[in-house]
C-alpha cells in the first residue's frame, strides 16, 4: 500500500478552501442572464462553449491532492442538484462556496464546528418550510414558458417550444431533445401510442404515396406468440369478413403460410389486414402488449393464461380510431380502452418508476407511461455550427428539467429574490447558544450570494443591488437582463421551487461536512524513476585488410 500524507486542522481547511474556490469561481461566472461563457478543452474536436454549471464542474481536476478533495466535494453539490432537479447547479455551487468560506472563518476564530453545523442545518430546515409557503403553482403554459426561458439563459424561443410541447403531450408525456438538421428549432409531436415496429410485408401498404398502411376504425388482435399456421387465425378472419372492418395483428412474429395467406387476402380485398411484430423483448414485450390491450380495450391472447388463438372471438379484440404503420413505426391513435383502466395502469407504472433503481429501466417505464398518458414530443435543436448545437442542446435539456420541476412543486420569484425573502423571515430563529446563532447567520448570509453573483455578472455593484432588494418586499427584485427593479413574477422571472430547495439543501449538507473536517488523508505522489540513459554508440569496425 502506498504511503499517505495526512494534513490536520487549519492547514487541511485552508487547502480544501483553495480547491472549493477554484471550482466555484469557474462555475459561478455562468450565473444569471448576463452570465459569461466558459470554454472547455476537448481531447479531440473543437472546444465546448457552455453556460451550464455542472458541465464546467465535471471538467475540473486539480493537481494538488488536498485542493482537489475540496473541489470534488463541491462538484458533488452540483451533480446532486443536477440529478435531483436537473438544474440549479450554479446556484448550489455559489451557496456551497458562501457557506464554506464563512464557516471556515468562524472555525479559525475558535468557534465550535459542530454547533456551527447545527445552526446551518436549523436555518436550512426553516428556509425550506418558508420556500414551500412562498411557492405558487405553475399550471398555465405562460408560466411554463417563462420558467423554461429563464433556465435556457433567457432564450425565449426555447421557452415557447417547451411550453408548446408540454401542452401537446401533457405533464406525464415524454419530451426528448435531439440534434436537428435545420437552423431553427423544430417540434415533432406523436399523438397516441407509437412503437418502433413496422409492417411485416410491403404488400400491406394501402397508401403508396406515403409508403404507409392506414387502417380506419380497425380491430386490434394481440398475440404473445409466433403465428405460422393460418388455421389458428381462421375463426377471427371469418368473423371479421362479416363486419367489413380492418384488422391489425400485433404478435411476436407472423411468418410462413400465415403471413402469405394474410397478404393474398389483403391484395384480393377479402379482408383488410396488416401485421406487425410486438415491441420490446422478453418481459418488457409482455408488459407493452398489455399496455396496448388496455389502451385499445382488448385482451392479450397468451397460452400461459389459458387463452388460445383458435378459440378467440371478436370480443377479445381491441379497437382504435385509426392506425398508421410505416416501414419502422406503428402508431395507434385514440384507442377505445376504458379511461379508468388506463389511469390505473399509468399509476401502476409510476409506482414501478419510484421503486426502480436502474436509470435504463426508469427511462423505459417513463416512455411506456407517456405513450399511455398522452404522447411523445421530440424537440429538434437547430444551430449553425456543431459547437453552437452542443451548447444549445445542453440549455434545452436544462430548461426541460426546470420546467418539470416547476410543474411538480410550483415556482418562486427568480433572480435570487426567493432566498433573500426567506432569509429575512427566519432571521429570528431560536437556537441554543452563540455558536449555533452564528451558524444561522452564516446560512442567512449565504442565501444572498446568488443575488450578489447575478448582479456581479451583470457588471453591477453587488452590495448596492442586494441592499435595494432587501429593502423591498414581496416579489420585488432585480432584473439583470435589462438592469431594472420590479415585481419578478410580473416580469416573468421565475425559478422552480424544487430547484431552489435542492440547491440550498445539497449546498448546506456538503458545506456542513467540510466545516467539520479536521484531517485530510491523500496518497503521496510517486516520483517516476528516471529514464534509462541512451546506450553508447557502437565503435566503428576496424578497416578490413
Swiss-Prot record:
Its main location: cytoplasm. The keyword Isomerase applies. PROSITE patterns: CHAPERONINS_CPN60. Signal peptide: none annotated. GO terms for biological process: protein refolding. Its EC number is 5.6.1.7. It catalyses: ATP + H2O + a folded polypeptide = ADP + phosphate + an unfolded polypeptide. GO terms for cellular component: cytoplasm. ATP binds at residues 30-33, 51, 87-91, 415, 495. One of its GO terms (molecular function) is unfolded protein binding. Keywords: ATP-binding, Chaperone, Cytoplasm, Isomerase, Nucleotide-binding. Pfam families: Cpn60_TCP1. It is found in: Cytoplasm. Forms a cylinder of 14 subunits composed of two heptameric rings stacked back-to-back. Interacts with the co-chaperonin GroES. Belongs to the chaperonin (HSP60) family. Together with its co-chaperonin GroES, plays an essential role in assisting protein folding. The GroEL-GroES system forms a nano-cage that allows encapsulation of the non-native substrate proteins and provides a physical environment optimized to promote and accelerate protein folding. HAMAP family: CH60. This is Chaperonin GroEL. It comes from Shewanella putrefaciens (strain CN-32 / ATCC BAA-453). The gene is groEL.
Amino acid at each position: 500500500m502506498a504511503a499517505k500524507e495526512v494534513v490536520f486542522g487549519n492547514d487541511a481547511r485552508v487547502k480544501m478552501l483553495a480547491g472549493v474556490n477554484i471550482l466555484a469561481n469557474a462555475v459561478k461566472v455562468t450565473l444569471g442572464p448576463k452570465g459569461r461563457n466558459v470554454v472547455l478543452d476537448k481531447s479531440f474536436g473543437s472546444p465546448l462553449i457552455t453556460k451550464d454549471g455542472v458541465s464546467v464542474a465535471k471538467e475540473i481536476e486539480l493537481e494538488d491532492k488536498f485542493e482537489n478533495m475540496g473541489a470534488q466535494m463541491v462538484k458533488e453539490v452540483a451533480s446532486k442538484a443536477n440529478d435531483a432537479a436537473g438544474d440549479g447547479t450554479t446556484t448550489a455551487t455559489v451557496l456551497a462556496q458562501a457557506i464554506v468560506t464563512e464557516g471556515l472563518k468562524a472555525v479559525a476564530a475558535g468557534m465550535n464546528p459542530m454547533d456551527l453545523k447545527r445552526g446551518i442545518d436549523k436555518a436550512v430546515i426553516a428556509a425550506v418550510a418558508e420556500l414551500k409557503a412562498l411557492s405558487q403553482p405553475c399550471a398555465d403554459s405562460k408560466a411554463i414558458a417563462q420558467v423554461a426561458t429563464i433556465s435556457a439563459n433567457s432564450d425565449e424561443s426555447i421557452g415557447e417550444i417547451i411550453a408548446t410541447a408540454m401542452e401537446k403531450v401533457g405533464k406525464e408525456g415524454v419530451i426528448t431533445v435531439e440534434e436537428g438538421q435545420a437552423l431553427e428549432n423544430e417540434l415533432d409531436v406523436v399523438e397516441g401510442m407509437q412503437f418502433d415496429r413496422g409492417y411485416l410485408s410491403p404488400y400491406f401498404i394501402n397508401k403508396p404515396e406515403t409508403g404507409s398502411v392506414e387502417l380506419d376504425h380497425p380491430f386490434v388482435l394481440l398475440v404473445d406468440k409466433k403465428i405460422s399456421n393460418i388455421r389458428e387465425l381462421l375463426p377471427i378472419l371469418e368473423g371479421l369478413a362479416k363486419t367489413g372492418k380492418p384488422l391489425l395483428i400485433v404478435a411476436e412474429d407472423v411468418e410462413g403460410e400465415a403471413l402469405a395467406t394474410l397478404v393474398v387476402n389483403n391484395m384480393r380485398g377479402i379482408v383488410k389486414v396488416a401485421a406487425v411484430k410486438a415491441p420490446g423483448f422478453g418481459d418488457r414485450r409482455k408488459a407493452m402488449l398489455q399496455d396496448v390491450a388496455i389502451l385499445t380495450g382488448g385482451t392479450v391472447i397468451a397460452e400461459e393464461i389459458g387463452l388460445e388463438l383458435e378459440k378467440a372471438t371478436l370480443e377479445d379484440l381491441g379497437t382504435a380510431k385509426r392506425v398508421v404503420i410505416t416501414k419502422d413505426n406503428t402508431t395507434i391513435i385514440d384507442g377505445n380502452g376504458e379511461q379508468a383502466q388506463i389511469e390505473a395502469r399509468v399509476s401502476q407504472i409510476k409506482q414501478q418508476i419510484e421503486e426502480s433503481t436502474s436509470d435504463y429501466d426508469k427511462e423505459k417505464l417513463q416512455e411506456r407511461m407517456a405513450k399511455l398518458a398522452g404522447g411523445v414530443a421530440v424537440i429538434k435543436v437547430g444551430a449553425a455550427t456543431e459547437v453552437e448545437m452542443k451548447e444549445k442542446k445542453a440549455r434545452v435539456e436544462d430548461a426541460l428539467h426546470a420546467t418539470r420541476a416547476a410543474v411538480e412543486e410550483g415556482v418562486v420569484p427568480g433572480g435570487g429574490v426567493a432566498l433573500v425573502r426567506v432569509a429575512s423571515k427566519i432571521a429570528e430563529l431560536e437556537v441554543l447558544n452563540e455558536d449555533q446563532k452564528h451558524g444561522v447567520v452564516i446560512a442567512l448570509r449565504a442565501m444572498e450570494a446568488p443575488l450578489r453573483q447575478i448582479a456581479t455578472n451583470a457588471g453591477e455593484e453587488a452590495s448596492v443591488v442586494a441592499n435595494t432588494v432587501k429593502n423591498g418586499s414581496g416579489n420585488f427584485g432585480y432584473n439583470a437582463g435589462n438592469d431594472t427593479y420590479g415585481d419578478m413574477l410580473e416580469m416573468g422571472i421565475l425559478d422552480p421551487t424544487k430547484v431552489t430547495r435542492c440547491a440550498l439543501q445539497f449546498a448546506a449538507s456538503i458545506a456542513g461536512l467540510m466545516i467539520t473536517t479536521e484531517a485530510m488523508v491523500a496518497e503521496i505522489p510517486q516520483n517516476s524513476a528516471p529514464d534509462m540513459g541512451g546506450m553508447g554508440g557502437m565503435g566503428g569496425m576496424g578497416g578490413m585488410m
